[in-house]
């Protein structure tokens, strides 16, 4: 299964109109980020893909003690000079991800639980407007009884 943050990164990179709109400036925490690519040094507009981690959620006391489903979350952060640019780029990202998911094998995609935005805000440190498009998914893993631990 492809990690959620890599799906989001690949979706953004695959959309030529979106890449043109942001001048090709995409940074992702799923790869090592050089000091030149860190958020505060990136010109506007830009996109930052963040991996927000995973957590296990067993259903009941009777659930198996071997976790087979994980809740994962990743987001696309859009930074821009104007609020309207943030809105436009968030919508472009949402469409890019939806198109990209259709190109993947069903087995490679996590189950989507929710998509939400954080809401536009002003970052006085950069300074810029920003918003986050947050994807929450469930990833299922199956184990064979004879499977060795990794």
Give the residues covered by each predicted segment.
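Residues embedded in well-ordered secondary-structure elements
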Residues: 38, 63-65, 124
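Oligomerization/assembly interface segments of phage tail-like spikes and tubes
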Residues: 64-81, 128-141
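Extracellular/virion structural assembly segments
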Residues: 65-66, 77-100
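Acidic-leaning, charged glycine-interspersed low-complexity segments
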Residues: 95-150
